[in-house]
Amino acid sequence: MKNLKTIGFVLLISFLVSGCAMDRSFRKESEPQKIIIERESSEKVEALAERVKTLEESVSKLRSEIVFLEKHFRNIQARPPLSSYKLPKEVTLCGEKIPLEDRNVWENLDREFIVALDSHAQILLWMKRARRYFPHIEKRLKEMNLPDDLKYVAITESSLRPHAVSSSGAAGVWQFIPSTGEKYGMRRNKTLDERFDFLKATEGALAYLKSLYDEFGSWTLAMAAYNAGENRIRREIEFQKAKDYFYLDLPMETERYVYKIAVAKIILSDPGKYGFYLEDRDFYDPLQLERVQIELKQPLPLLGVARAIGCYYKEIKEMNPHLTEESVPVGSHFLNLPQGTSERFWIFFNHWRKELEGK
């Protein structure tokens, strides 16, 4: 009996010792696993946090899109059907009354009015671009004592697209054909086409319109001549023995031309009245630039100009669409620069010129 107790005691001690050893071994084996689990948990938390951040950004974008679509939908709902818009009872253009009491005249204007109103995207673009280009045109019209309504000629000519080119070869915002452009000082060769220089073309267009008015004594006839050419209008006046644009038989494009200008004025004078709404941030930025005049004996690389004044080459090219090559050609030229960069330009230009002279 005593031996059995002794054996039992020994077995108990052995069990306890082996158990402690196993516990130590288990703890040793568990510690790396715990570290691995903690590391994996940390990585999962970071991944989840990154995923949450991505989802939050997506939600933010979706919210912005929802706000935009809701606003767009409200605008569509707010716009009455096209048939509800009516022409004003009286319409003038450059101070000249359009004879709407004549049903044929009213019908012609009404047709252009409806066609324009149906071109929702086009009118929005008119509004956006007008903020960019109209201020300069309005300023020059006022300085030249010309009717403010002449700015709408540029809308009808090109929708204020500076790179516009027609099938007949007319170019720029004011759509000059080569011969008329040259007559009003716009040079054209393989290195430049100044019909695309908005500022220079504006000077030419306003001078041309004034010249046409001086000849025909009517702004509507002057506009018609701007479209069809003064020779054509002279011939039609002589042949038809009539001097009123609205009662002359003219080419279809010219017959519609002045009506389109009048419609542009009607809509852009009060776009909200016809269901067109834009917030201030939706408009294109006004034209802001500095214009320098330079005399060149060697072509001036535009890339060098861009680097010197701290802008991209593309920006310089877009500001000077009349320059068709990579350099400003030899001769006297105007160069458009981003606002606030002319001082840096002159430092570069004078240094560049001295280097050339030293060679």
Predicted regions and their residues:
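Sec-dependent N-terminal signal peptides
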Residues: 6-15
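N-terminal secretory signal peptides that target proteins for export/translocation
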Residues: 1-3
